From Swiss-Prot:
It holds the Pfam family Bac_luciferase. Keywords: Lipid biosynthesis, Lipid metabolism, Oxidoreductase. Catalyzes the reduction of the keto moiety of phthiodiolone dimycocerosates (DIM B) and glycosylated phenolphthiodiolone dimycocerosates to form the intermediate compounds phthiotriol and glycosylated phenolphthiotriol dimycocerosates during phthiocerol dimycocerosates (DIM A) and glycosylated phenolphthiocerol dimycocerosates (PGL) biosynthesis. This is Phthiodiolone/phenolphthiodiolone dimycocerosates ketoreductase.
Length: 381
């Protein structure tokens, strides 16, 4: 069984380097390593608490990134990256909030990027996170309902053929609205939905070109959710096999198991486990430090967490859970883990290089070659 494709995703954090240099360097690496796509995140501030964004926990990365919450705006950056884009690389946002921007603006931004890239833009979209909405006055009581309406609005505008359109909606009503940007050669950007709960999975089946969850932790969970997406697609009269099964996953690798285990023990890496719902923690006999019923990454507000709180939470992360949250191990072990996910339906993985946040500079550097070996192995799956 073959055909697995992969892409890279980066956070857009302001650094001491020229604004586009890190992203363009990553794009070049993606091209060399055979990636299909390059993605950027969409955050007003970081998901890593600023209280631990220091050299003690981030190592050399903290020297280059003095303010972890200084995030660039993604569509502006993607528009810049579109010029000089390698001929086959696709560009995407992973993922934009459905409610923080009016969906008409999102539809316009994605369609513009699609024209700039000659048909290689991807609109990744989800409900977003509380940290990027509620503190800024964006209503957060019904994020899934807002998402459904935003997605329906984007599709309605793209399908309007430049005619006036009116559409009732509790969140994004259209009254004689007009959307006249053309698709690129008859095709709009693909919509990749980050969905996890039952209602979001159904919306994915109705509207999306791909499903790209971020916090599914076990391959068996992935295959069950994928079946829900495909069932919803069938119910909507769509071809269920036309929806690309994707996922965002971190990779922690190194020269040997000791280096990998050390990286998995880092506080920054452990913080990713806070984004996993409480039920996954309970499976390992530990209550989520933010409550047994905590829903996960969408409800974290990291900028309010002080250092001691973060350290106390990190100390509670079960080692077995960390090994579910990310692909980890020697290159061969990581490739085997990805292959297991492929056997459960995964066909596209968007990778986060978690090895870069090891506090040890030496071990960050020595993880480069093992990481490259993983990527070479993925091309054979």
């Amino acid at each position: 069984m073959g055909g697995l494709r992969f892409g890279f995703v980066d956070a857009l954090v302001h650094s001491r380097l020229p604004p586009t240099l890190p992203a363009r360097s990553s794009m070049a690496a993606a091209t060399v390593m055979g990636a299909d796509s390059y993605w950027v995140g969409d955050h007003l501030n970081a998901l890593v608490p600023r209280s631990i964004a220091t050299s003690e926990y981030l190592g050399i990365a903290a020297k280059f990134v003095p303010k972890i919450d200084a995030n660039y705006e993604p569509w502006t950056m993607l528009g810049n990256l579109a010029f000089g884009l390698p001929s086959r690389l696709r560009l995407g946002v992973c993922v934009t909030d459905a409610g923080r921007r009016n969906p008409a603006v999102t539809a316009q931004a994605a369609a513009t990027l699609h024209l700039l890239t000659r048909g290689r833009a991807i609109l990744g979209i989800g409900v977003g996170e509380r940290e990027g909405n509620e503190p800024y006055g964006v209503e957060w009581t019904k994020p899934v309902a807002r998402f459904e309406e935003a997605l329906a609005t984007i599709r309605a505008l793209w399908n309007s053929n430049g005619e006036l359109i009116s559409r009732e909606s509790p969140y994004f009503p259209l009254h004689n609205a007009l959307f006249d940007l053309p698709p690129y050669r008859g095709k709009w950007p693909e919509i990749w939905v980050s969905a996890h709960g039952p209602r979001m999975l159904r919306a994915t089946g109705r509207y999306a070109d791909a499903w790209i969850p971020i916090v599914v932790v076990r391959p068996s969970d992935y295959s069950r959710a994928l079946e829900a997406v495909r069932s919803a697609a069938s119910d909507a009269g769509r071809d269920p096999m036309s929806i690309t099964p994707a996922a965002v996953r971190g990779i922690i690798t190194g020269r040997n198991r000791d280096d990998v285990e050390e990286a998995l023990e880092s506080v920054v890496v452990k913080m990713t486990a806070l984004g996993v719902p409480g039920e996954a923690w309970a499976r390992h006999g530990v209550e989520h430090p933010m409550g047994a019923d905590f829903s996960g990454v969408q409800d974290i507000i990291p900028q309010t967490m002080d250092k001691q709180t973060v350290l106390s939470y990190a100390a509670k992360v079960p080692a077995a859970l960390m090994k579910e949250v990310v692909f980890s191990g020697t290159p061969d072990e990581v490739i085997d883990q990805v292959a297991e996910w492929r056997d459960h339906g995964l066909r596209y993985v968007v990778l986060i290089n978690g090895s870069l946040v090891n506090p040890s500079l030496r071990k960050t550097v020595t993880a480069v070659l093992p990481h490259a070996k993983v990527l070479r192995g993925l091309k054979k799956l």
